[in-house]
Structure formats: structure tokens, C-alpha cells
Amino acid sequence: MIVAITGATGTIGSAVSAHLREMGHEVICISRNRDRADVYWNPSEGLIESQGLEGIDAMIHLAGESIGNRRWSKRQKTEIYSSRVKGTELIARTLSELDSPPSVFLSGSATGFYGDCGSNQIDEKSPKGSGFLAEVAADWETATTSAEEAGLKVTHLRTGIVLDPQSGMLQKILPLFKLGLGGKLGKNPRRKPSPNYST
């Protein structure tokens, strides 16, 4: 199987890419870094080398500005939003225009879709919540519409913050906890979905 992936160098994407290769699948890395890219793209400029996607079996779209790298200034919130929504619109439109499109499009989303639910239990049928991340996630999912209309099977992957000591949020806060300087993460009671690579 030939699988194209955006965000292949991120926390989730690098693990998914490695797993797919171990299973014998071919992975096509879609990246803004020409040195790493099998297929180059620049979503902020609406550019993608679409010919490199002809004949793929599946598309996994995980790219987007990290929500935990910087303070959420107005500019950073715009980057978080546009990197997800505009990037997804570009991927979906490109897939819908291919002569030989994939049958499956797995597109990133987030558990932020549900907003702050406190200790309430939620599942994929739960309604959209309120707040910035809920709006981002809802628009992110809507951005796949052109691919759905073209007949691709679209699945939205609503993931939480992945806890990995080698990258992401945990890598940043772990040294503080090891020094005894850690504290509560968020207000209580609160559920935090924390996927790991085995899920």
C-alpha cells in the first residue's frame, strides 16, 4: 500500500510513518522542507506537487502548528487556525482533483472539538463544545468537504495531546517535574485524553 502523510516528522506522524514502513508499506512524506519531502507543499501559498500523489492508496493528514509551542497571541492563534484549516482545504481539494485519488483520507482533528467538558464522559457522538479549540476543530473537519464530495472515505482523527518524553508537551515539562517543580495541569476535575503509540 502507498500512503502519503503530512506532518510525517511530528510526534504522531513520525511514529505512524515508522509503523507503516515496518509493515512493508511505502510512505510518501509531504513536507514544507524540500530536503525531507517526497512531495513538496506550502499550504500558506496554496502550493502542492499534486503529481506525486497520483495513485496513492491512502492519505493521512496530520500537519498543523503545534498548540503548545508558544503563547497564544492573536498571531499564534491565527497560525494554529490557518495551518489546519487552509492546509486541509488544500489537501482535500488536491485529492478531489486527482485522476487516481486514494480511497481513504484520514484527516487530523482534535478532542478540543468538544471544548472543556470537565469530568463529563464524551464520545464521537457528543456535540461540539465552545471556545477557540472547538471552533478550530470544527472548521478543520469541515475543510475536508471537497474530498467527501468527490467520493473519498473521510475519517477525522480527534486526538488529544500525545505524551511522549522525546517530543511535544511532555518533553518540555518533564524536566520541571523531575526537579520537583511540577504542578496540576489544568483545573480539576478534568479528563485529558492522552493517546500513546499503542492506541
Q: Model-flagged regions — what are they?
A:
Residues 3-23:
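N-terminal Rossmann NAD(P)H-binding glycine-rich loop of SDR-like oxidoreductase domains
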Residues 6, 30, 59-63, 105-111, ...:
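SDR active-site strand-loop-helix element
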Residues 25-32:
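Conserved glycine-rich Rossmann-like NAD(P)H-binding loop of the short-chain dehydrogenase/reductase
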Residues 35-36, 40-90:
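NAD(P)H-binding glycine-rich loop region in Rossmannoid oxidoreductase-like domains
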Residues 79-87, 128-131, 135, 139, ...:
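Glycine-rich NAD(P)-binding loop of the Rossmann-fold in SDR/ketoreductase-type enzymes
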Residues 89-131:
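Conserved Rossmann-fold NAD(P)-dependent oxidoreductase catalytic core, especially the SDR/UDP-sugar
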Residues 130-154:
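Active-site Tyr-X1-5-Lys
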Residues 148-150, 155, 160-196:
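NAD(P)-dependent short-chain dehydrogenase/reductase
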